[in-house]
Amino acid sequence: MGDTRVTVIGGGLAGTEAAWQLARAGVAVELVEMKPERRSPAHVLPGLAELVCSNSLRSDNPLNAVGLLHEELRRLGSLVLGCADETRVPAGDALAVDRERFSEAVTARLTDHAAVRIVHRELEELPPPPALAVIATGPLTADALAARLAETTGGRLHFYDAIAPIVAAESIDRSIAYARSRYGKGSGDDYLNLPLDEAQYHAFVEALLQGEKVAAHGFEEPRYFEGCLPIEVMAERGLEVLAHGPLKPVGLEDPRTGRRPHAVVQLRREDVDGTAWNLVGFQTRLTWPEQRRIFRAFLPGLANAEFVRLGQIHRNTFVDAPRVLAPDLSVRAAPHLFLAGQITGVEGYVESAACGLLAARAVLDRLAGRAFRPPPPATALGALHRHLTGEAHPPGYDYQPSNVVFALFPPLTGRHRGKAGRKEAHVERARKELAPWIDTAPPTAVPAAPAAG
């Protein structure tokens, strides 16, 4: 395979994972990333694999669907999971990372790989056939390339994601904030908590509703992903919605009083040293002046908050994957092009990396002249593939982005004791099914990790 060069466009989680999987199988890769020549509105760091929303890759517990996906990716030698483990910061049972060190680690691994050539330029045209290419340009695909992709697929849609603010640690009032992880998970100081009584909470919700928001372009109708809703959009759904959502106080009793607040704002550390903390669930489209005003005035403990980063919104572009893509993630109308990551309609960092891995394996199968061998459907990777092909959805389904969830898995057979029993059955079945699929992988220089448990 060494004489064949594959182009990977996009240096995010999907693109870097695809490039890594191809390179470790002996394929020469040209990884094209538009930074620093051009940056999207949401990108700040100079390196690859920049995390622009949260610094959390979510639950690392395999009894959670995304935690099971973590496990499967580790077993398959994932670059993203390997670097995440190396740069992990305490976050209870979640896999959170120091985002700068994580980006640096991914960048270094690919820069040092002899089979990878990184090119920094913006592409405005899709690569022509017959050479194979992986398009992993993500939710912030530049306009020119997005237009070319729309012409090719006829399937472009977009909605908006929103980014949460980050606060400098020294500006948080520790006489008000208290350290505690929900239900006592983790080391106990993975999160800081800002308690709100009922009056404070209601005043905050009213401020969110009245605050000035960034307007969308007149020709674009915002379509938010339910898993990343702006906090003010949730507030619009009802007075107590936030108190039952990201500000839920359950399991976060104030150790100084022994009482549960009416609502709690959680802050999760951004780095190992805890110099910066992000406001969990506070994705927002409030204007920057309004964010400073509202969060300082209405959130206890943030009266003197210094914001390392303020929230913002950005467009998310994705194709109607079940109709646009073949089962091997190649574009039906242009089979030399493979899509990976959020542009396919997967949602989440880990799902994007997993999609990059799947696209790379599909390319390897194409190069070897064999049919694509999809992951077993009962695995987390297989469930994600079922989402992309539409197999997990009813006929006529209005395709929307999705995280990996057990609802995407094939139904279980037999009887299982409660929700926990069903999760355990899903995990046991997935582990059994993944092993033989791993054995079909092309030879690599990096051994796969053993199964957990």
Curated annotation (Swiss-Prot):
EC number(s) stated in the UniProt entry for this protein: 2.1.1.74
Binding site for FAD: G10, G11, G12, L13, A14, G15
Catalytic activity: uridine(54) in tRNA + (6R)-5,10-methylene-5,6,7,8-tetrahydrofolate + NADH + H(+) = 5-methyluridine(54) in tRNA + (6S)-5,6,7,8-tetrahydrofolate + NAD(+); uridine(54) in tRNA + (6R)-5,10-methylene-5,6,7,8-tetrahydrofolate + NADPH + H(+) = 5-methyluridine(54) in tRNA + (6S)-5,6,7,8-tetrahydrofolate + NADP(+)
Stretches the record annotates as Disordered: 433-453
Gene Ontology biological process terms from the UniProt entry: tRNA methylation; tRNA wobble uridine modification
Cofactors required: FAD
Low complexity bias (residue ranges): 440-453
A GO cellular component annotation in the UniProt record: cytosol
One MF term in the entry's GO annotations: flavin adenine dinucleotide binding
Alphabetical list of Pfam families matching this protein: GIDA
Main location: cytoplasm
Keywords of the record: Cytoplasm, FAD, Flavoprotein, Methyltransferase, NAD, NADP, Transferase, tRNA processing
Disulphide connectivity of cysteines: none
Similarity-based family: Belongs to the MnmG family. TrmFO subfamily.
Primary role: Catalyzes the folate-dependent formation of 5-methyl-uridine at position 54 (M-5-U54) in all tRNAs.
Protein name (database record): Methylenetetrahydrofolate--tRNA-(uracil-5-)-methyltransferase TrmFO
